[in-house]
């Protein structure tokens, strides 16, 4: 799509340079034939290093645009990105015309649905009522329990177990808001990648990325009823206990443990070997190799001292 057509669609001033744009992506992931966006000056460093061919940007930030990147001046870059995402959204069905490739040793229940272009590896089992979407790749020795739904283009490694009722690759909860309070859907054009030896409990929801990937790295084990939002990256051999919620763009190192009902606020990083106790709330990036508890989050030993102090104060007041 011509950049000038994008400008016309968004009702923005025409660009100074014409170029062909094939997609929309983040500043970090964009290529010279993709467009990105900048809403705030705190992303200036990412913009300077971006390879994006064009960028939606406020007039006040034009001086930050690197050479080779064509600006489209917008009063509301994030909102215009949401509107633009619809133009580049893949259709939910019919994009792939190829017949699915199912390995001879795979077992597929008669009531399971396998979409066009899907690939099912050797010895993989897909049970009753499961839906494998178009373009999904399932590795070898996987076990997909009843009524699992795996949306299009999801990539799953070897020896992955997904228990009943889980949904992989649905759209994340992403909206931009107009001045009148309307909510404009951000179409999610990324994918989900689940690496080797991952096990997902029942009724998990793992959302596809807005751009790029949501990724669950190898060896990670996730309990029942867990929500992992768009663009999260969960490190190798991590443990996630029931009812955890990870907000969008949460990333973790390896061997991180999330206790039951703990949560993150998104756009933050949890370091290697960190442990979040049950109901802990992570609101900013934290170091690894420590145990944390409470909300506001603090080191577990400090939380224990606080609880003891509160108990002491209550006794004094009685």
UniProtKB/Swiss-Prot annotation:
It comes from the Bacteria. Pathway: Bacterial outer membrane biogenesis; LPS lipid A biosynthesis. CDD domains: LbH_LpxD (cd03352). It is an enzyme of class 2 (transferase). One of its GO terms (biological process) is lipid A biosynthetic process. GO terms for cellular component: membrane. Homotrimer. Belongs to the transferase hexapeptide repeat family. LpxD subfamily. Catalyzes the N-acylation of UDP-3-O-acylglucosamine using 3-hydroxyacyl-ACP as the acyl donor. Is involved in the biosynthesis of lipid A, a phosphorylated glycolipid that anchors the lipopolysaccharide to the outer membrane of the cell. This is UDP-3-O-acylglucosamine N-acyltransferase. It comes from Wolinella succinogenes (strain ATCC 29543 / DSM 1740 / CCUG 13145 / JCM 31913 / LMG 7466 / NCTC 11488 / FDC 602W) (Vibrio succinogenes).
């Amino acid at each position: 799509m011509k950049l000038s057509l994008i400008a016309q669609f968004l009702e923005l001033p025409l660009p100074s340079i014409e170029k062909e744009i094939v997609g929309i992506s983040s500043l970090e992931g964009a290529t010279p034939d993709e467009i990105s966006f900048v809403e705030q000056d705190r992303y200036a460093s990412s913009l300077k290093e971006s390879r994006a061919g064009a960028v939606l940007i406020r007039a006040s930030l034009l001086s930050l645009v690197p050479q080779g990147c064509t600006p489209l001046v917008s009063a509301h870059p994030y909102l215009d990105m949401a509107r633009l995402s619809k133009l580049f959204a893949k259709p939910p069905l019919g994009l792939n015309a190829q017949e699915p490739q199912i390995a001879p040793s795979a077992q597929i229940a008669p009531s399971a649905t396998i979409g066009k272009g899907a690939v099912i590896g050797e010895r993989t089992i897909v049970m009753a009522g499961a839906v494998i979407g178009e373009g999904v790749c399932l590795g070898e020795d996987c076990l997909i329990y009843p009524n699992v739904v795996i949306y299009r283009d999801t990539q799953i490694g070897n020896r992955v177990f997904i228990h009943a009722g889980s949904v992989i690759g649905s759209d994340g909860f992403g909206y931009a808001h107009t001045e009148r309070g309307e909510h404009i859907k951000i179409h999610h054009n990324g994918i989900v990648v689940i690496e080797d030896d991952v096990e997902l409990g029942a009724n998990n929801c793992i959302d596809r990325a807005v751009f790029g990937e949501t990724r669950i790295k190898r060896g990670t084990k996730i309990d029942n009823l867990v929500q992992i939002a768009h663009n999260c990256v969960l490190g190798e051999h991590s443990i996630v206990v029931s009812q955890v919620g990870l907000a969008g763009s949460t990333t973790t190192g390896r061997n991180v443990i999330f206790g039951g009902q703990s949560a993150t606020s998104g756009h933050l990083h949890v370091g290697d070997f960190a442990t979040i106790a049950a109901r802990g709330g992570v609101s900013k990036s934290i170091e690894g190799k420590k145990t944390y508890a409470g909300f506001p989050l603090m080191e577990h030993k400090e939380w224990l001292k606080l609880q003891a102090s509160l108990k002491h104060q209550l006794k004094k007041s009685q």
